[in-house]
Each structure stands twice: as structure tokens, then as C-alpha cells.
């Protein structure tokens, strides 16, 4: 399963992803760590400080390639935590992978506004979560929605 946690910067993607990672690690039927793909870490790894559309496309395509490899070769759950503002790139991931769950996270908080993407393409995710509550409450909401 590939979990795509996406939304504007500061919406809680990494925080929620860490909760999900811990949950999956402790499942009796799973027993191994999920592959974590954090957009900011990818930018550091591939030295991509380009926040234009071209730079974002490259970062997301790198993430999609890693997630596809983890799914098909490693048979591991993957948690993607990226801004991921382009529906066509999320659709590309779905073409190559059968088990993809999209969760759009949003907040009214004003965090990291200079990195926000104009014309963000929310698309039609399976789930949408407002993260203006505490991280613990957001995690509870996530578990209920995804029936974990």
C-alpha cells in the first residue's frame, strides 16, 4: 500500500506520516518498517532547491519512482509526505501501482506560506482531513477514516 499524504506546507504531512509509520510497524501481520518519503528530505538528497513547477515535478517524480520500487520490488508499505500539488503526477503514481490511498491535508494556520503553491490541484482524494486540531486528534480522525 502506498499512502500519499499531501497538502500545502505546514499542513501536518510529516507529523501524520510518523504516526502512521509507528502504527504500521507494530501491526502483527506487517512487522517491518514502512518506506518513508519526505519531500524536504528528497530535496536535500537530490540537491533540488528549485520550487518552480519544473523543480516540483522533478521532486515528485523522484518520490513516485522510489514508492513504485518499494511497492513492486521490496513489497513494503510506503508513506509519501509531499506537497504534491499536481493531480497528473498523483495519477501517474496510480497508473504504476494498484494500491494507492490519497489523503489531502489542509489547515487554516499560516505556516511556511512562502512555499505555498498557487493553483494547488487538490483533485479527488479518497480522504480529506483538516489538521487544525492537535496531532493526536488528527491521528484519531485519520484512523477512523481509513478504518485502521
Label the predicted regions.
Residues 54-97, 105, 109:
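Glycine-rich phosphate-binding loop used to anchor ATP phosphates in small-molecule kinases
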Residues 11:
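ATP-binding Walker
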Residues 106-148:
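Small-molecule kinase domains that catalyze NTP-dependent phosphoryl transfer to phosphate-bearing small molecules
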Amino acid at each position: 500500500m502506498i499512502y500519499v499524504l499531501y497538502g500545502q506546507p505546514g499542513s501536518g504531512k510529516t507529523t501524520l506520516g510518523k504516526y502512521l509509520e509507528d502504527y504500521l510497524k507494530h501491526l502483527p501481520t506487517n512487522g517491518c518498517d514502512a518506506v518513508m518519503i519526505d519531500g524536504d528530505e528528497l530535496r536535500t538528497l537530490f540537491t533540488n532547491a528549485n520550487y518552480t513547477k519544473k523543480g516540483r515535478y522533478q521532486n515528485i517524480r523522484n518520490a513516485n519512482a522510489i514508492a513504485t520500487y518499494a511497492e513492486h520490488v521490496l513489497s513494503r508499505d510506503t508513506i509519501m509526505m509531499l506537497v504534491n500539488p499536481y493531480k497528473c503526477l498523483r495519477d501517474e503514481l496510480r497508473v504504476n501501482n494498484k494500491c494507492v490511498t490519497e489523503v489531502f491535508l489542509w489547515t487554516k494556520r499560516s505556516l511556511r506560506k512562502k512555499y505555498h503553491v498557487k493553483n494547488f490541484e487538490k483533485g479527488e482524494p479518497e480522504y480529506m482531513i483538516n489538521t487544525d486540531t492537535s496531532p493526536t486528534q488528527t491521528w484519531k480522525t485519520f484512523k477512523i477514516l481509513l478504518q485502521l
